[in-house]
């Protein structure tokens, strides 16, 4: 089983929308994976001022094969009185064999509904490689994000809530080559805008969160918020005070900083 890493690097995202975008991206990708019958263990969503990211753990190599029943003409139309295939029945069989199969009338089955009985064939559809499916899944999820007003940047015709600057897409330690939001995928991310502004390589999808910490970014929204709460409480306790932190304001502050450091004014 592998870990898929996706990171969308942008200009600063609107702080009042960041948590909503994080949750919507996670939910959309989860739904799309289920729709494609792709199993996984967990999706961990990250959101910081200049990035949205996901790690998807426990992902296999291929979709499972599936059975698709092909319905043909009615039994009455498919066979003549002698039990031989009519032109309608032959046409159905030829259509099944058009992709290289060598089926005969003995391979055909029958299905019935309230309108009658029909010839049919249970077609096995081989599962696709999951890394081939991920780029389209992720692009669809981005297209479906609840963004009231999208924008273009320069000559790029792809729209998003803010200009996109880089895309990371990996399966374990291998880049999944694709184009998302008009940008080629890679393994290059960026840290804190001032403390670690240069690109750095992600060597493995499982190392994402720790690598960002090494480059002065707490990528996990909830962890940043917990750090802010703990720091502010400590500062308040030092002067026997009580910190007043409305949740809406706390969410906004969490969305504004990569590496929170609380200060107490005199």
Swiss-Prot record:
GO CC terms, sorted: cytosol
Compartments in which it is found: Cytoplasm
Entry EC no(s): 6.1.1.14
Catalytic activity, reaction form: tRNA(Gly) + glycine + ATP = glycyl-tRNA(Gly) + AMP + diphosphate
Superkingdom per UniProt: Bacteria
One MF annotation (Gene Ontology) recorded for this entry: ATP binding
Keywords: Aminoacyl-tRNA synthetase, ATP-binding, Cytoplasm, Ligase, Nucleotide-binding, Protein biosynthesis
EC top class named in words: ligase
InterPro entries in alphabetical order: Gly-tRNA-synth_bsu, Gly-tRNA-synth_heterodimer
GO biological process: glycyl-tRNA aminoacylation
Family affiliation: Belongs to the class-II aminoacyl-tRNA synthetase family.
Subunit structure: Tetramer of two alpha and two beta subunits.
PANTHER family found in the cross-reference section: GLYCINE--TRNA LIGASE, CHLOROPLASTIC_MITOCHONDRIAL 2, GLYCYL-TRNA SYNTHETASE
Protein name: Glycine--tRNA ligase beta subunit
Organism this protein belongs to: Moraxella catarrhalis (Branhamella catarrhalis)
Biological classification of the source: Bacteria, Pseudomonadati, Pseudomonadota, Gammaproteobacteria, Moraxellales
């Amino acid at each position: 089983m592998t870990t898929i890493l996706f990171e969308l690097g942008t200009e600063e995202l609107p702080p009042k929308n960041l948590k909503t975008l994080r949750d919507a991206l996670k939910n959309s990708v989860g739904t799309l994976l289920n729709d494609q019958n792709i199993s996984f263990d967990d999706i961990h969503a990250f959101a910081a001022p200049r990035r949205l990211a996901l790690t998807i753990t426990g992902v296999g190599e291929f979709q499972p094969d599936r059975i698709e029943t092909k319905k043909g003409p009615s039994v009455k139309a498919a066979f003549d009185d002698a039990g031989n295939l009519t032109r309608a029945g032959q046409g159905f069989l030829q259509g099944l064999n058009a992709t290289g199969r060598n089926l005969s009338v003995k391979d055909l089955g029958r299905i019935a509904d309230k309108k009658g009985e029909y010839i049919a064939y249970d077609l096995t559809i081989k599962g696709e490689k999951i890394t081939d499916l991920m780029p389209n899944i992720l692009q669809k999820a981005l297209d479906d994000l609840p963004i009231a007003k999208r924008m273009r940047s320069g000559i790029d015709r792809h729209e998003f809530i803010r200009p996109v600057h880089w895309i990371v897409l990996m399966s374990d330690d291998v880049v999944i080559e694709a184009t998302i939001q008009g940008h080629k995928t890679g393994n290059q991310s960026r840290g804190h805008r001032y403390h670690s502004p240069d690109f750095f390589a992600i060597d493995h999808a499982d190392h994402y969160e720790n690598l960002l910490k090494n480059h002065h970014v707490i990528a996990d929204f909830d962890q940043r918020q917990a750090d802010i709460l703990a720091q502010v409480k400590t500062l308040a306790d030092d002067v026997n005070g009580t910190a007043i932190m409305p949740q809406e304001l706390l969410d906004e502050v969490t969305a504004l900083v990569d590496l929170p450091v609380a200060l107490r004014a005199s």
